[in-house]
Amino acid sequence: MDHGNDSALPSTIYTVTVNDALALDRPQGMAGEGLAHAGGLALLAMAGALQFSIAIAQILLALALLCWAAMLVIRRERFTAPAFFLPLAAYAGATLVSAAFSSDPRTSFVDCKQLVLFLIVPAVYRLVQGQTRTLITVVLTCAAVSAAVGVIQFGILHYDQLSQRPQGTLGHYMTYSGLLMTVIAIAVARLLFDSSDRTWAALVLPALAVAVALTSTRSAWVGVCAAVALLFALKDFRLFAILPIVAAVFFALAPGMITKRFVSMFDNKDPTRIDRVAMVHEGERMIAARPLTGVGPNMVEQRYADYRGDDAVNKINPHLHNNPLQIAAERGLPALAIWLWFVVALCRDLLRRFASGAQRFLAAAALAAVVALLTAGLFEYNFGDSEVLMLFLTVVTLPAAADTSRFQVVSRRSDHQAPLAADL
């Protein structure tokens, strides 16, 4: 045996892999991995449950957040999140400031509980990782079942009037259509950009499209059209040639009330259109009166009569049916600026990931979800709809969660940690 040349030994002794780092502290590593696995499963179940029950979905989210927080403590990991979480956190801070200056702080602070949903971003970022495609499949499958329920409600149970529309098992047709809108964006993105798993998306897409059409929710229709247009533009402009065919099929097969509802979007005498114009004026008055902090979270409905003009159709409205207008009136112009910062930061991140070529399907799906939310949000305050917001935050975080290049082995003198992300 030759003992004269040991110079090659360090290259094997000091090569540390991810599994080696976890094995150096086996009890903490096993506990942390168990929590990460449980939290990831809870998030997958949450994404599916959103299609059926907000209560079940939020219970699952609470379990996921508990697992995530416990894992950070046990494994002594630092908090990590995608870069776009910073403006989202700042928006939460601006909301709390607005609540403090509200005419009814108690009501406003109670409404601020929705800010907890923002933690979906770091939780999905850390816990989902290699399960991103599975999560998408779960969402598509559950949405297909929910869509079937909506079609049955319309065709058999006679949910075929504006006063009673298909809503699946959810509490409101606007939430139902908003979720379907986002899932349609995901399904079309998978068809156009995924290298595999296209079959299931192709099978469920017709049911999703029919269900969202039957809700008679015009804002969701606009969101779907905008999302699909973006995906066509990203893939191949020649795809726009099929749009006239789709339009012809729609008008040929859609029930009369659906086509009438579609045409009403262009009717200047439509009462809902007139009332939305009036809401813009109410919002402008609220902003002019309290530009810095707004009237306070969840206070638009209570203060609506104070700012209502003669052109208003409804005496009271729960919100202003427009994301930027609602945020500015409710939380102030600084909060709106921060929210726009979040949107820009998110879009830049997703465009960068799409251009890089890695996980193009997830990036395209997330971009389509953003466009759908923003365009539909010109006619509906969907950023304040908990179910829609939960699915939206989950989908837009998936490209970052799937980015394995963010992991690195971190070794310390006292302990060895699992790979950590370094975006924040």
What kind of feature is each model-predicted range?
Residues 1-106, 123-133, 137, 191-194, ...:
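Transmembrane signal-anchor hairpin modules in multi-pass inner-membrane enzymes, especially those
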Residues 3, 148, 232-272, 278-289, ...:
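A membrane-periplasm/extracellular boundary helix in multi-pass inner-membrane enzymes
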Residues 40, 63-69, 238-240, 245, ...:
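Transmembrane alpha-helices of multi-pass inner-membrane enzymes
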Residues 42, 47, 96-97, 131-162, ...:
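Alpha-helical transmembrane segments of multi-pass inner-membrane proteins
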Residues 55-71, 111-123, 175-184, 221-229, ...:
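Membrane-embedded alpha-helical segments of multi-pass membrane proteins
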Residues 100-109, 213-214, 378-383:
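Membrane-interface helix caps and helix-loop-helix hairpins in membrane proteins
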Residues 267-278, 293-331:
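Long extracytoplasmic/lumenal interhelical loops at the membrane interface
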Residues 331-371:
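Hydrophobic transmembrane alpha-helices and their immediate junctions
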